[in-house]
């Protein structure tokens, strides 16, 4: 019966069948089915009903079709539905079994059965009851091991229990539980209980053996021990299965002992009649369950049937099952059975010989039978049909049989011969009705009917033909042996017996008459049967012919059906592929249509966006143009406001600087005023003393009569008189001889005071006390070169640009008298006023005049205050304009000399070389911090001074001879011009500096032009600040030309030190080449000459040189 399975059922049942078929032989035996079905949680009675329905043929095992029926019945029982297994339903639930690939909703929702013990209880009531199948199986095992007595000793029980794959500890606990009498042996109840516990442990129903078992459970384990097996296992209690011997396996073809035990159990299930062998019909259905081809099964049958008798005993059955197992595992079958395989089943073959086989017994016919003339009915014939392989196998035991009874011949002389009648010849043995009933394949009607026409059956399958060949060859021996038994001569009867027989003659005669009558009836019936037989033969031949034709047609139809099935399957596959392709194409077309619609919509949206974007762009362009125009206007306004802010800022800075200047001047003036006051008091005291001495000398002169005039003493032709400026600074103002007056020079004692008030000379005798010590003059580290040096001129320019921070015009000239420089000038600020550019501005020689004053000994203006001489007290008015203001006071001898010198050309060794410095000008830098590139003709940028190293020098203006003003004249009105013997013209724009410390942060970039006409460009963005307008103006770059011969002259330190310690004093007035100005300062003339000829010395100062290099790299 074929059942239509769903996909879920097919998947689930395949997995469950593989789990239940532990031996992997293609069928599920009763031993394997019991523990498997118990996991469903159903009662044993329900499982027994399910087994009877699934195993309808009562074969003792389940094929896959029977297993499917059992699974559906289990699912229906779990859902408590009627047993209708023809309809598909849910998948049954089995404890501890997981099935993959099936939805959980397809399973029966059933919890774990409660009747299965977990092994944790201490009472035996937790153990499930022993099913009848298990009880029968356990009883067979017990009776096999103990056939006589009712006890199983420990060795035999341990050998059986030890076959379970459990630990020794668990088996010992099981033994202690079931050995209730502690006698070292088990009866059938205890043995069944122990086997049941072991089975529960193996299938997972119990995790561990229980603590104790109730006596009632053990007593119920043997309640069915004397009852025969249930209907599905007929005859198991009558014939226990043969146990497989324990044969060591050393050869791959030898059958293992475990397999032999399993095969013997299967043999007992298949051999339901316990004949000791398995017929072809019984083996055929069992072998087909392995799903092997029929030709392979036929080969296995040929190898297993060692006796070629068409049936398999227990040893041959084990061989066939082992060969099936090897073939299923993928191994090839041997051509001939190996000796190791035969030796492994040899004990089973010997035991099978002692089992009687069912051979039909031959008995003589009973002559005195009350029914001597049985009626023979012909075998009915039906329509021909196609036989299957199973029918071929089932018909092997139905041997062709056509019994005929020969007529009996008795002695005519009944009185002389009294012997039982016998048949003379019989072609087939007479079989008893009992034997016929036990012969499979015979009809239920009487078989011993003579003249019964039968036809010989020829099986169609190769497997059936192989078995039929072996079976058809055997009955010939039996048929040939029967006549020999019937033809045996009857032994002679003794005389006594003859007398007895003679007494029975009348009786026998009467019987003879009856027999004759019966013979006549039989002959008549025989003739009738012969006539019927000819008719039947004719009909049989016709039917045989029709059968063969129909058989050929059936085969052809079968072939056509198979071909059509193959074609139909191919067409169905192609149809499935085409249908899937069509669905895929339709789906793709639909998707592409949707994408096309979406793309079209997006394209339309993009076009609209482009149009709106173009309109927005045009609008934005117009707005951008308006914004740009507005922005340009705003930029113009911003530039204008920026310029205004810059102007205001510069003006603010100028005012702040002016304020700081004034505060600084006020502080200096206060300090100088205090110093001058002290000096004034000292001079007053000295003057009083001198007056007293003078009065004494005058008194002495009056008393002395001079007869002749005293020689004229040699005094300084340029007497110096102390003078106090308006800010309290004392200055030395030379008094030049008046060429227009013939007033003789007065000789008084003020010259001594004047000499006393002079500053100590570098070469005077007053400094001899310090000759042995190291000079602290920073200029002693410089070397002296020739009469004139560009370095000295550069110092003059540096000091002029640093100490005169204000610039009225773009060009300011400064020339320092080399004979009036004092080291004390380094600590005083210098002021420089603007001068008008002379008419010969384009020439290389520019006349400069000076109006600076140096604090020192009293000058003429101060002396005039002391002596009470008249001075010009007119205060000059400060002029803030850019134009220079002329001095309204009378010209001084300095100015007269300078004006005369301005008209004459200057002849100097390097008068043709011009040094120009762009604005802004920064404070002076000592030679030790200058770059060493001066030897190459380039004056590098000076590094800033450290604080208080070289403070700026301040020069106060020189008052006029007739002036006695107490206030400082405005800086814009000063126009100092001093003529120097070797003059170098400097043209620079000076920037007003906020304070002395801030002046050190400024720097001056000087461009020097080498005699070889190598031009070095100056900074491209030099600017100077105009104090009158408060704005910066760009200064054009100029070139500076320096005589490299003069620059390269070394400085003589030895000469400088010797001249520093010299006691001789230079005269106050000194004439230099060209036009020389008078010395207005109280300093040494020799130092002035040295200062004019200074040259930078090569001094290795790592710190200063690194600073110079960094600053030089920053500017370049």
Curated annotation (Swiss-Prot):
Highest taxon in the source lineage: Eukaryota
Q: Which GO terms describe its cellular component?
A: actin cortical patch; cell cortex; cell division site; cytoplasm; growing cell tip; plasma membrane
Q: SMART domains attached here?
A: EFh, EH
* Subcellular localization: Cytoplasm, Cytoskeleton
Q: Where is the composition biased (Acidic residues)?
A: 957-969, 1055-1066, 1104-1116
List the coiled-coil residues.
565-707
Q: Show the stretches that span the lipid bilayer.
A: none
Which part of the chain is the EH domain?
9-106, 134-224, 259-348
Query: Which keywords has UniProt assigned to this entry?
Result: Calcium, Coiled coil, Cytoplasm, Cytoskeleton, Metal-binding, Repeat
Question: Which Gene3D superfamilies does this entry report, sorted A to Z?
Answer: EF-hand (1.10.238.10)
- Region annotated Disordered sits at 360-454, 703-774, 812-890, 909-978, 1004-1024, 1044-1066, 1095-1116
Q: Where is the EF-hand domain?
A: 8-43, 42-77, 166-201, 292-327
Q: Where is the composition biased (Pro residues)?
A: 371-381
One annotated GO molecular function is:
calcium ion binding
| Residue ranges, compositional bias (Polar residues) | 401-416, 723-749, 864-890
Q: Which residues bind Ca(2+)?
A: 305, 307, 309, 311, 316
Q: Where is the composition biased (Low complexity)?
A: 755-774, 812-827
Q: Which PANTHER family match?
A: DYNAMIN ASSOCIATED PROTEIN 160, ISOFORM D (PTHR11216:SF170), EH DOMAIN (PTHR11216)
Can you name this protein?
Answer: Uncharacterized calcium-binding protein C800.10c
The protein's organism comes out as: Schizosaccharomyces pombe (strain 972 / ATCC 24843)
